[in-house]
Regions:
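Outer membrane beta-barrel
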Residues: 127-286, 589, 618-619, 628-633, ...
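Flexible, surface-exposed loop regions and adjacent strand-edge segments
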Residues: 60-67, 150-157, 215-221, 275-283, ...
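Transmembrane beta-strands of outer-membrane beta-barrel pores
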Residues: 49-55, 139-143, 203-207, 262-268, ...
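Detector for outer-membrane/organellar transmembrane beta-barrel domains
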Residues: 113-115, 377-380, 384, 451, ...
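Membrane-embedded beta-strand positions of outer-membrane beta-barrel proteins
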Residues: 43-45, 135, 199-201, 248, ...
Length: 680
């Protein structure tokens, strides 16, 4: 006996994905087929050229930091005793209380292209009897990111920003040749076909669960490349990052099957890289260390790493010159930049080992051909979190730093700065051993496909508010050193001593549930086909601490929940009356998709208009879930043309709006995209 495979639900949900994201534009019917003796093979190729344009004006009052307002001139600034503007002058201006989230917004003006990309995608499939090999690779070049001019330069030096300066950032978003899938497989019919067995080994994508549009569900096995996903003409098979693993599926009975995987490779989500239009954090992501994390506690502009190295080279030269400089003056100079920026260390990656999962599948024909899934996974976070190391402002630490500088005059680099005790440091980390327990089903109700899933995570790491982390790392250490005792208790993270490494996250249990409805209307209203999809989901955070105990990180929150009896001190730290809400213990939202099809509209051209609407209804999920932000909405309108399964063209418009206060970081980044494709 063989396991019965019910095709309707799977194909309907797959069609829902295609309808929703419109990523699989061209089929593989034109693939080149060939034979090498008993080996059968196919080779597919798709080439794409596309561009995106920003169509909305930047929101200077809500999304741009106060220090980056155009009326300020920061040229010739130095923290060594050259304060250009007072805190009161900066405080009086419109804008955000943080300048750690506005770089990408400043780089692109209304009407600018944000991407000009050409790329190729190739797939090779070989099969011999019951064995096979599959490989997929791609290459791309984004002219805008590699060669484009930008409206915003470094506020101090005037240097033009280069989003491709860092090698990893360049590979992720600027240009690259990469191997995606690369695995071998074998299929066996055990016991005369009663127990079919499939095995795959290599870099591959494993898709579990029933979610279509709402992420962070059961399907967390493979990370996503958000840079490629947001590029013109993106396809899902380009965006899901294959990981090295062994996967197997075994049919136990006619209705019961088991799947399992073991990963020997770990890869993270590639978040939008600083400098790309979709990035909402200036220091997280590849190359973010160049921007530093701006503390903003004084009247200072954004201070990047190159400028800090330049200034410390000057200080080191003064020390090494032998000139007599009072110790008090040297200490003041040693404090100038550590009180204004936090340096960013290299990422701390988890182990490749210890990641595995099991799925038990059951097909119930007596329940309307329903398929059930039961899941368990142990995995390491693919989503970035921020931890840190506190500064040490003790006299001994400062004198030690000055000695190191004097001994290395002429050779000041990033590694040396990171070794200095007086700087606080931020670091992207990926905590290990998250346990996921899941349940899913899919069935049909007439012509409507229904899929649902529940994912319960044990010990999921959730980001503590970054302001609490920064406050614990710097101003609290000024209090510990007796320099500013009035700063004591400024952060909700208490007990942090000089030089301590601080986990920037807490582990809590979370539960996420969602349901998806996909309906195929067929020919209707003059259309050859109409597909509609609706997905609704919610997230519960179990035992989440109250706001007065510990606040978790969400978008647009630039204030501390520390000692409420020090409002004057809070204001002195450039942390004003911003009132955006913090994450909540429950949040939910929904997504709607409609896709119409007009076959052979003219001269053999097929046309497919589509609409995607997203609404985060209530509550805010903490980072790094990146799911729901109360009141946030978006609508995407698209029009796709296809000719003879070879040529394709797509035009889309994306509009972002809504949100409470300034929590919707994309609210002023509407854009249009266009691409053409050719496939053989």
């Amino acid at each position: 006996m063989k396991i019965v495979k019910k095709s309707f639900n799977k194909s309907a949900l797959a069609l829902g994905v295609a309808s929703a994201l419109s990523l699989l534009m061209i089929s593989n019917v034109n693939a080149v087929a060939f034979d090498w003796g008993e080996v059968q093979g196919t080779f597919d190729s798709t080439w794409t050229a596309g561009a995106s344009w920003r169509v909305s004006e930047r929101d200077w009052d809500g999304q741009i930091g106060k220090v980056n307002q155009p009326q300020f001139d920061w040229s010739n600034y130095t923290a060594f005793g050259n304060t250009k503007y007072t805190s009161a002058e900066i405080w009086a201006q419109p804008g955000s209380y943080s300048s750690n989230n506005d770089l990408s917004n400043l780089l692109y003006s209304q009407g600018d292209t944000t991407s000009e990309i050409v790329k190729g995608l190739h797939e090779l499939s070989l099969k011999y009897e019951n064995y096979g090999l599959f490989a997929r690779g791609m290459y791309f070049y984004d002219r805008k990111l590699n060669d484009g001019n930008y409206d915003f330069n470094d506020p101090i030096t005037g240097k033009e920003f280069d989003p491709c300066e860092d090698n990893r950032a360049s590979e992720v978003q600027c240009k690259d040749i990469r191997l995606l899938d690369a695995f071998v497989y074998a299929n066996f019919d055990l016991n005369d076909g009663a127990n079919p067995l499939s095995i795959r080994l290599g870099n591959q994508v494993v898709s579990w669960g029933e979610s279509t549009l709402i992420a962070h569900g059961i399907g967390e096995i493979n990370p996503v490349d958000l840079n490629i996903l947001n590029a013109p003409g993106a396809e899902l098979k380009e965006a899901f990052r294959p990981q090295g693993m062994v996967w197997a599926s075994l049919g136990i009975t006619e209705n019961l099957s088991v799947e399992a995987f073991y990963q020997y490779d770990w890869e993270p989500i590639w978040v939008p890289t600083p400098g790309s239009i979709f990035a909402t954090n200036d220091f997280a992501g590849f190359g973010g260390y160049n921007q530093n994390a701006q503390l903003g506690f004084n009247a200072n502009p954004d201070i990047n790493l190159d400028f800090v190295m330049q200034e410390y080279q000057r200080l080191a030269g003064m020390i090494a010159s032998g000139q007599t400089i009072p110790t008090q003056q040297l200490v003041a100079m040693a404090l100038a930049y550590p009180t204004k920026v936090t340096l960013v260390q290299d990422e701390q990656e988890p182990s490749n080992d210890g990641q595995y999962g099991v799925k038990l599948g059951y097909y119930a024909p007596e329940l309307g051909d329903t398929e059930f899934g039961f899941y368990f996974m142990n995995y390491h976070s693919r989503r970035p979190l921020i931890s840190g190391t506190a500064a040490d402002f003790s006299t001994g630490a400062l004198l030690s730093d000055l000695a190191v500088l004097g001994q290395n005059a002429g050779d000041i680099n990033r590694e040396l700065l990171l070794s200095l005790k007086s700087f606080s440091k931020a670091q992207i980390v990926y905590p290990e051993d998250i346990k996921l327990y899941g349940f899913s089903f899919n069935t049909s109700l007439g012509d409507t496909s229904v899929g649902a899933e529940i994912a319960h995570r044990q010990d999921e790491p959730l980001q503590i508010d970054d302001v609490e982390l920064l406050f614990a790392g710097m101003p609290q250490q000024l209090a510990n050193a007796g320099i500013r005792p009035d700063f004591d208790g400024i952060s909700q993270i208490d007990g942090v001593k000089p030089g301590d490494t601080v986990d920037g996250f807490i582990r809590l249990d979370t539960t996420q549930a969602q349901v998806t409805f996909t309906h195929l209307f067929g020919p209707t209203l003059g259309l050859d086909n109409l597909t509609m999809l609706a997905e609704v989901g919610g997230v519960w955070i179990h035992d989440m601490p109250g706001f007065d105990e510990l606040r978790l990180n969400g978008p647009g929150t630039a204030r501390s929940g520390g000692n409420p009896d020090m409002p004057g001190i809070i204001q002195a730290l450039h942390n004003g009356p911003e009132t955006n809400p913090f994450p909540t213990d429950f949040a939910w939202g929904y997504r709607l998709v409609a896709k119409a099809e007009f076959n052979n509209l003219f001269a053999g051209v097929n046309m497919s208009p589509r609409m995607i609407f997203s609404h985060d209804v209530d509550g805010i999920t903490p980072d790094p879930m990146f799911l729901f932000t109360e009141g946030r909405k978006s609508v995407a309108l698209g029009l796709n043309f296809e000719y003879q399964n070879r040529w394709g063209a797509d035009l889309s418009y994306n509009n972002f709006f809504g949100g409470v206060g300034t929590t919707n970081a994309m609210a002023d980044r509407d854009y249009i995209s266009f691409n053409i494709k050719y496939s053989i």
